Amino acid sequence: MNIDRNRLIGSVIFIFILVFIDQWSKYLVVKYISIGTEYLSFFGDFFKIIHVRNTGILFSIGANINSSLKNLFFLVIPIIILVFVFCFILKETNKIARIALILILSGGIGNIIDRLFRPLGVVDFLDVKFFGIFGLQRWPTFNFADSYVVIGITLFIIYDLFAKNKSTDL
């Protein structure tokens, strides 16, 4: 595999910065906000910063499964997937697709760090009102890593649907 050194260095720096922002924000939440408490509210109760922990995955799915299965499904398999994502980043020549993959990888790394080093679970702290859409008054609490993954997947889907066949290198 022929790897462009500048692309590799740029990607690693971008990943490092995103993971640092995620972990620093979680560190501040853990240090200054007790679990289960609200710290700040913006625009009435539209946006809140609160401290909760998630031992499952998206929407706390799997929070109550056996710890051996949890390690397999929430650590081992995601790490393997992230290795493949990193390989795709190194081979990808399209900037939009590469940024999307970097966002996905950075979010995955951020949450895996939590799973490895925070026994109480992944730190979630961003809480947004959802106005009853899909029956939810509030969107499930999330963190920057979760946002990176969602934005990355969305960007990649948009790229794949609309830009992929129009240009090989944006």
From Swiss-Prot:
Its main location: membrane. The active site is at 124, 146. One of its GO terms (molecular function) is aspartic-type endopeptidase activity. It holds the Pfam family Peptidase_A8. One of its GO terms (biological process) is proteolysis. The keyword Transferase does not apply. The chain crosses the membrane at residues 9-29, 72-92, 93-113, 142-162. Keywords: Aspartyl protease, Cell inner membrane, Cell membrane, Hydrolase, Membrane, Protease, Transmembrane, Transmembrane helix. InterPro entries: Peptidase_A8. It catalyses: Release of signal peptides from bacterial membrane prolipoproteins. Hydrolyzes -Xaa-Yaa-Zaa-|-(S,diacylglyceryl)Cys-, in which Xaa is hydrophobic (preferably Leu), and Yaa (Ala or Ser) and Zaa (Gly or Ala) have small, neutral side chains. One of its GO terms (cellular component) is plasma membrane. Its EC number is 3.4.23.36. It is a multi-pass membrane protein. Pathway: Protein modification; lipoprotein biosynthesis (signal peptide cleavage). It is found in: Cell inner membrane. This protein specifically catalyzes the removal of signal peptides from prolipoproteins. PANTHER family: LIPOPROTEIN SIGNAL PEPTIDASE. Belongs to the peptidase A8 family. This is Lipoprotein signal peptidase. The gene is lspA.
